[in-house]
């Protein structure tokens, strides 16, 4: 399975994402700030980064910029509780980035992770 960097400043969200990804067999590297996410990316070289857009000290888009300077091909999923036209305009310049709206369901999140990693999804009911 994959090594996945998950960055979110909300401990409850980070715990849930860590739990679900670990249950899927992935190794999770956790970060609670943007700066920590960049540092842990450099140390661990994950196969996927899951980044909250709004974090203290450095938002997910700045983290994405820092990651892209080192690895322009790393798959990235941006997660947010905010949706709207202004957010869409901010992120439309990023190629190869998936988006996940918090609260959309963990099954949907796992499917997006698998799709982004190029792994088969779970069969439906």
Predicted feature residues:
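Receiver (REC) domain active-site loop signature in two-component systems and cognate sites
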Residues: 55
């Amino acid at each position: 399975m994959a090594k996945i960097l998950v960055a979110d400043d909300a401990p409850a969200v980070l715990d849930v994402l860590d739990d679900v990804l670990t249950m899927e067999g992935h190794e999770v590297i956790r970060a609670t700030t943007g700066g920590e996410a960049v540092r842990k990316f450099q140390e661990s070289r994950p196969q996927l980064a899951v980044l909250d857009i709004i974090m203290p000290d450095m938002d997910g888009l700045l983290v994405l910029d820092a990651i892209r300077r080192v690895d322009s091909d790393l798959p990235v999923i941006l997660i947010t509780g905010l949706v709207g036209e202004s957010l869409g305009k901010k992120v439309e310049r990023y190629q190869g980035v998936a988006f996940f709206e918090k609260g959309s369901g963990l099954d949907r999140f796992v499917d997006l992770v698998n799709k982004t990693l190029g792994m088969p999804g779970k069969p439906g009911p």
